[in-house]
């Protein structure tokens, strides 16, 4: 949305008949803070996760008041979803909640699994392609799709770097001119920057150089 090249025709077609919010702001970014906010229903300043690393990349612990099940287990969105908005309770005819995602592995964020009845890790740290994820989802749906009362979360990484479109797609934008704002001065400024997904690390980075 808002990009000058036609890189997402299917999403654009969907958007023509969908609601577009012009003044919406994410409460917590990027990936790890946003997922934790989604899971807990709380801002990062309250759940403890506001960064990808350091002391602010793990949920706050319950402390001395923690019971057998943690607050994450009792109040995470899968638990709330399964209980119609109420905290988790055992021995109920709950909605079955399932996640197919390598997010927890990629970010060492295993609190993401809290409240899910089933969790499937594709095992490639988010470098898997949609067909690999879909194969697991298709198998689960074949076995369970005809049942009632379930929620299936399927996480595909293809829109995320490194962008892995099939080779058959070619380079459809190779001959298109660059936008007018992209001057040599702008290019040099970005090139001198640093960090994951910057101009010099456009494909991301490996936490351990030996894994790169």
Where are these regions (language model features)?
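Catalytic domains that recognize anionic headgroups
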Residues: 1-212
């Amino acid at each position: 949305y808002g990009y000058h090249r036609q890189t997402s025709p299917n999403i654009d077609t969907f958007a023509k008949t969908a609601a577009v919010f012009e003044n919406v702001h994410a409460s917590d970014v990027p990936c790890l803070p946003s997922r934790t906010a989604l899971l807990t229903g709380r801002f990062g300043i309250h759940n403890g996760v506001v960064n990808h690393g350091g002391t602010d990349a793990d949920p706050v612990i319950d402390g001395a008041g923690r019971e057998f099940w943690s607050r994450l287990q009792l109040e995470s969105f899968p638990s709330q979803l399964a209980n119609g908005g109420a905290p988790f309770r055992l021995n109920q005819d709950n909605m079955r909640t399932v996640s197919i995602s390598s997010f927890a592995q990629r970010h060492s964020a295993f609190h993401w699994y809290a409240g899910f009845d089933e969790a499937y890790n594709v095992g490639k740290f988010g470098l898997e392609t949609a067909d690999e994820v879909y194969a697991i989802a298709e198998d689960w749906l074949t076995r369970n799709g005809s049942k009632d009362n379930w929620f299936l979360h399927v996480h595909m990484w293809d829109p995320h770097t490194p962008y892995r479109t099939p080779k058959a797609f070619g380079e459809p934008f190779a001959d298109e001119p660059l936008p007018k704002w992209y001057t040599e001065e702008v290019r040099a400024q970005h090139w001198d920057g640093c960090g994951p997904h910057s101009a010099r690390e456009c494909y991301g980075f490996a936490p351990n150089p030996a894994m790169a």
